[in-house]
Amino acid sequence: MLPVQTSNLAAAFTDAVRALAPADAALPAVTFERPKAAAHGDLACNIAMQVARALKSNPRELAQRIVAMVQADPRAAELVAGMEIAGPGFINLRLTPAAKADVLRAVLSEGDGYGAQERGMHGNVLVEFVSANPTGPLHVGHGRQAALGDALANLLSWQGYDVHREFYYNDAGVQIQNLAVSVQARTRGFKPGDANWPEAAYNGDYIGDIAADFLAGKTVSASDGEPVTASGNPEDLDSIRKFAVTYLRNEQDIDLQAFGVKFDHYYLESSLYTDGRVEAAVQGLVGKGKTYESEGALWLRTTDDGDDKDRVMKKTDGTYTYFVPDVAYHTTKWERGFTKVINVQGSDHHGTIARVRAGLQGLDIGIPKGYPDYVLHKMVTVMKNGEEVKISKRAGSYVTVRDLIEWSNGGDETIRGCLDAGVADWPEHFTRGRDAVRFFLLSRKADTEFVFDVDLALKQNDENPVYYVQYAHARICSIFESWGGADWESRLAELAGTDLAAVTGADASPQALALGQRLAEFPEMLAAAAGELAPHAVAFYLRDLAGDFHAFYNADRVLVDDEAVKRARLALLAATRQVLRNGLAVIGVSAPRRM
């Protein structure tokens, strides 16, 4: 149902239950769900069973009394055609054809806004994701973060939040020093495996590319920074470090552009040190009595906030542990006015959650407990030609996002080849690969491990989930082209006043009714997915919607001689196409007109 329909019907049920309950009774919210069998109706409600004990009533008898009161409520009369009691006290409802038709009309009138809420009505939210170290190309784990984070940001935007996308660069610490030493070794002619190759060095081919460009004195720049020109001097380790970090940030920018992800802000870890924020956070915790010294180190009393043991903040060598700059960074999020913050990270960050939250609570600056929220994802395994792929020649030790996009795109075209050739619209050349990677990485819950099958991503049949969904959209477009010619979109307005009885009334096929019901679920599905921080639910929904469409297409011929039936079925398809477009837009996947 439409949100307003659900609200009115829930209000009718709630008022009925309240009239039967003691004045001081605590009542659960009334909810509706789709019955497992279509024969049981359009909706089911279990409120009678939920409150029977509190009302000291038999659930079935209570359900009968609720039904009688709801049937007399004018808010329900225009929505509900009939109600039946099943089993121990379920209330099954059949909706009126008018209520079903209102859904289709809402989709057609609201168009690209169907399912969306007014921007800003829920305040602002910061979503941090990807946040890779600038020490190498983005790997498939970063790709899963990018797909999850961007889809979640889109989802929250659809639900009325002002969304701020942020990338936190870990550009300080020992890994950056290892990067600089690795590039320096290549500038001196050493390679992985040589006796003089540094023990902690990075081995990918990209290190050699950076070294060659550094020796050539080239200039590189990242999307949010000043250009950096290489000194060309192999002994100038500071110049090598700055050049290498900026070079890799630019490479990551290219990967994100290919993936269709844009950030509002890039925050540098190094700035937390130069601005004195890390030291300020530490001194703030010391001043609040949340720390103590032991064995030459400074410890944070994280057990005060539920951690299993206290944690070292400052090691004996004077350096800070990993979570300390994270505490400082999150104080900036709070100070910038982001009262809701969501971090999308790998499951290997699980251990830092309690530490960061304990640090924020210890500062006692008004940050609520449980801040920030986290969405943690598990690892991705890549399969190609029936075998697991563990190593990329470019990266040296892992499969990159760029590899995955290029492999899933089909053909021999590469992103680097397009860039070197000066192809201005190069990202559009990789739409197929981008769509496949984004959809696939959202096709499982974040907390489950995922196997990315490149061979499956290349298939053009129903086995491929993104093809299955996109083909539903393309097939609808083909039907409309047969109906209205090349300019069919301009004729869709003709369907606005269509009599929809053929797809919502007594003579409508089960497939048409099921498709219409699925369209009605879209707004509430988005709201639930946003509330649960679960963008995978959108991908799940789109697969179900595509399945309902294909079932309808196989059951009901659309372009029939009966004009009233034809127009009603075209209106149903126009609504289906719109919801497919909207759902795909939420997860950042294209809706092609032809395939």
Curated annotation (Swiss-Prot):
Belongs to the class-I aminoacyl-tRNA synthetase family. The gene is argS. Keywords: Aminoacyl-tRNA synthetase, ATP-binding, Cytoplasm, Ligase, Nucleotide-binding, Protein biosynthesis. SUPFAM superfamilies: Anticodon-binding domain of a subclass of class I aminoacyl-tRNA synthetases, Arginyl-tRNA synthetase (ArgRS), N-terminal 'additional' domain, Nucleotidylyl transferase. Pfam families: Arg_tRNA_synt_N, DALR_1, tRNA-synt_1d. This is Arginine--tRNA ligase. Its EC number is 6.1.1.19. It is found in: Cytoplasm. Disulfide bonds: none annotated. A motif ('HIGH' region) lies at residues 132-142. One of its GO terms (cellular component) is cytoplasm. It catalyses: tRNA(Arg) + L-arginine + ATP = L-arginyl-tRNA(Arg) + AMP + diphosphate. The keyword Ligase applies.
